[in-house]
Each structure stands twice: as structure tokens, then as C-alpha cells.
UniProtKB/Swiss-Prot annotation:
This is Chromosome-anchoring protein RacA. The keyword Cytoplasm applies. It comes from the Bacteria. Residues 160-175 have a biased composition (Basic and acidic residues). Keywords: Cell cycle, Cell division, Chromosome partition, Coiled coil, Cytoplasm, DNA-binding, Sporulation. Signal peptide: none annotated. Residues 3-23 bind DNA. NCBIfam families: PRK13182.1-5. The lineage of its organism: Bacteria, Bacillati, Bacillota, Bacilli, Bacillales. It is found in: Cytoplasm. It comes from Bacillus licheniformis (strain ATCC 14580 / DSM 13 / JCM 2505 / CCUG 7422 / NBRC 12200 / NCIMB 9375 / NCTC 10341 / NRRL NRS-1264 / Gibson 46).
Length: 186
């Protein structure tokens, strides 16, 4: 039975059950998800703990009677006397199978997360490249505008320079010859 069921049977909160297990270092099994799983023996121990606390015994003075489990060793196998070897083997096989299934699900979930992170990373890299390209385009466009502006300035300066030359040439042509030059024409 899980922690919630044990707490209901004892008439305490789930946190209280968890605290007792941790502080008194009670041997409680855990399922494949890491949650406590209590047997009838565990519930009996927890009931004793509750009774001692109810009678005013401080937590550090609570004594726990742990049932002694005996084992026979036969051909390098350990067999618990309370449970036949076949049932124990079946339970172990079942737990192992559930554990392997859980591990497979965890592995698949991790692979999906990795694939999603890789996809996001590629997308972010594409966005960065796109941004850089847009920035370079803007810079190129600004440079083109500057070049165009400079070309216009150069054209204006060249046309002004031509006009000034033309004006200077016309002035030279229109200037009356000085009297001295007219007297001495060679």
C-alpha cells in the first residue's frame, strides 16, 4: 500500500508517515517511481510508533521492534522463509519488468527532450544567421546610399567646376584688350 493509504489507516497525514520513516530509519520499500510502498508488517510497526507517541514518548526515545527475517542459504541462493522461492522469483521478475519498462519510458522521454532541444538550438542558430544577414543587408544598403550621395556630390562639384571654367573662359574672351596691347599688336 502507498503512503496515502498507510496514512489513512493510521489516521495521520502522509507527511507524518514520511517523517517517521526517515527519522526512525524504518525499512520501507519503494516502488519504481521512488514512492514508499508499505507491507502489513510495516503498517504494524507504524502503528506501534503511533501508540508510543500517543503515550507521550519523545520521538528520539521511540523504540521499533523490527521483525527478524531468517534466510536459508542453499546453493548460493538466499530464500526467505516467509515467502516461497517461486513467489519471490515471480515478484522479482515482475518488479524487474516494471523497472525495465519505466527505464525504457524514461529513455524515450529523454530522447524526445534531446531532440526538442536540438531542434530549438537549430532554430535559434537559423534565427541568428537570419538576423546577421538582415543586419548585413541594412549595412550594405546604407553604404549604397552613401555611395549614391557621394556620387551626386561629385557630379555637382564637377558641374560647378565646369561652369566656373566656362565662365572664366568667357570672361577672358569678353575682356577688352588693353590699349597697350592694341597699340602693339604683334
Amino acid at each position: 500500500m502507498n503512503t496515502a493509504d498507510a496514512a489513512n489507516e493510521l489516521g495521520v497525514s502522509t507527511k507524518t508517515v514520511q517523517r517517521w520513516v526517515k527519522q526512525l530509519q524504518l525499512p520501507a520499500s519503494r516502488n519504481e517511481l521512488g514512492h514508499y510502498f508499505f507491507t502489513e508488517d510495516d503498517i504494524a510497526i507504524l502503528k506501534e510508533v503511533k501508540e508510543q507517541l500517543k503515550n507521550g514518548t519523545p520521538m528520539q526515545d521511540v523504540t521499533v521492534k523490527r521483525p527478524k527475517k531468517t534466510f536459508f542459504i542453499k546453493k548460493n541462493e538466499m530464500i526467505q522463509t516467509k515467502e516461497p522461492a517461486l513467489q519471490l522469483n515471480e515478484r522479482l521478475e515482475e518488479r524487474l519488468q516494471r523497472f525495465l519498462e519505466h527505464e525504457q519510458l524514461e529513455r524515450e522521454l529523454l530522447q524526445k527532450k534531446i531532440a526538442e532541444l536540438e531542434r530549438k538550438l537549430e532554430q535559434k542558430a537559423d534565427e541568428v544567421v537570419s538576423y546577421q544577414l538582415l543586419q548585413q543587408r541594412r549595412e550594405l544598403e546604407e553604404e549604397r546610399q552613401q555611395i549614391k550621395h557621394l556620387e551626386q556630390k561629385i557630379s555637382q562639384l564637377e558641374s560647378m567646376n565646369r561652369r566656373e571654367k566656362d565662365t572664366a573662359v568667357r570672361r577672358e574672351e569678353k575682356k577688352p584688350k588693353s590699349k597697350l596691347k592694341s597699340i602693339f599688336s604683334f
